[in-house]
């Protein structure tokens, strides 16, 4: 029985990217919401809610990026020159966020500066992730197996709008995480922010669902052609279901339901992108088979992935299990 190794690896990398988005998304969302909570005590609790897990969440970014370079080198060599600027700014934002997270607990006199760095780094990293996604969706020109565009091709109204939409989406993840992990006045305020961000996310998903099909003929065929239209019609219905669960959970104070609903919205958005892209890894220039490394390399790397991915899943699940439940405002991890 022959295995379609490029397809298997595309699924692994897609899973790693999705895991990064939904896991690092909520702690970036906490940083995005930082300016809306002025009290030092609230900010301390917010940071303590993500302190045990935030750095482990970025493991999935390393797996996704490293896997892309090793398994789909042609796609990596094509996408990277097209997105140098947003990716570099994203990494700088993540560095600022990480440094601020640690140094904020070590100083009192300059604490407000690290608060600014934490919020600013989270916003820059999120916005640039959205811009990079928008630039990929709108298409990257390829000629002779190399990037054929200009330095600023990534900066368009569509990519900027995608960056803003991701800021709203991560704010939703962060707010629902705070609803689930905190209590009292902080959780009550987080519910208000979650409802606003949820409405914004729903509107953004609707706008991009109407906008994206007209970016490429491939997308239009995927969303409105038969038989894929039968699957694509399910996505907006499920989105509305997740939004209803979000609102119901916020109103009835079932604190885990809003976070699960927010995760569902991101999974459905990711599924929509998958419907639009497949079988392309660089739309509409390179398929996963055209961009893949030799079969021998894919098989060798798959052996390592079959060991590492379950290990990452196991320690991630264990960390979340150990630190489950509400954060005690009087205790912390720093």
Residue ranges and their predicted role:
Residues 1-56, 62-65:
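N-terminal signal-anchor module of multipass membrane proteins
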Residues 1-13, 69-84, 137-157, 214:
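Helix-coil boundary and interhelical linker segments in multi-pass alpha-helical membrane proteins
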Residues 9-20, 81-92, 119-124, 153-167, ...:
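Alpha-helical transmembrane segments
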Residues 28-52, 70-75, 79, 102-112, ...:
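Juxtamembrane membrane-water interface segments of multi-pass membrane proteins
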Residues 53-122, 143, 222-230:
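Membrane-interface helix-loop-helix modules in multi-pass inner-membrane proteins
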Residues 103-255, 272:
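Long, contiguous internal "core" modules enriched in hydrophobic/ aromatic residues
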Residues 260-267:
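Central hydrophobic cores of alpha-helical transmembrane segments
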Residues 282-301:
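Short, membrane-exposed interhelical loops at transmembrane-helix boundaries
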């Amino acid at each position: 029985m022959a295995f379609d190794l490029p397809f298997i690896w595309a699924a692994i990398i897609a899973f790693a990217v999705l895991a990064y988005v939904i896991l690092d998304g909520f702690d970036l969302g906490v940083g995005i919401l930082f300016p809306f909570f002025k009290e030092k005590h609230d900010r301390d609790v917010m940071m303590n809610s993500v302190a045990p897990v935030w750095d482990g969440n970025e493991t999935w970014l390393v797996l996704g990026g490293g896997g892309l370079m090793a398994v789909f080198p042609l796609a990596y060599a094509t996408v990277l020159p097209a997105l140098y600027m947003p990716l570099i700014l994203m990494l700088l934002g993540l560095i600022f966020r990480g440094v601020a997270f640690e140094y904020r607990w070590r100083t009192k006199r300059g604490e407000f500066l690290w608060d600014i760095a934490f919020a600013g780094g989270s916003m820059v990293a999120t916005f640039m992730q959205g811009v990079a996604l928008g630039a990929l969706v709108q298409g990257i020109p390829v000629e002779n197996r190399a990037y054929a565009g200009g330095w600023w091709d990534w900066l368009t109204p569509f990519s900027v709008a995608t960056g803003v939409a991701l800021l709203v989406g991560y704010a939703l993840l962060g707010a629902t995480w705070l609803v689930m992990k905190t209590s009292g006045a902080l959780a009550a305020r987080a519910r208000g922010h979650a409802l606003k961000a949820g409405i914004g996310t729903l509107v953004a998903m609707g706008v991009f669902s109407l906008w994206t099909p007209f970016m490429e003929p491939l997308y239009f065929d995927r969303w409105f052609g038969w038989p894929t239209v039968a699957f694509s019609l399910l996505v907006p219905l499920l989105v509305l279901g997740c939004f209803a669960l979000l609102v119901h959970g916020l109103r009835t104070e079932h604190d885990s339901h809003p976070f699960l609903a927010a995760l569902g919205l991101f999974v459905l958005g990711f599924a929509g992108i998958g419907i639009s892209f497949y079988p392309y890894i660089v739309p509409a220039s390179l398929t996963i088979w055209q961009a893949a490394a030799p079969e021998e390399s894919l098989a060798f790397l798959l052996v390592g992935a079959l060991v590492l991915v379950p290990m990452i899943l196991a320690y991630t699940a264990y960390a979340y299990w150990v630190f489950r439940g509400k954060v005690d405002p009087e205790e912390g991890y720093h």
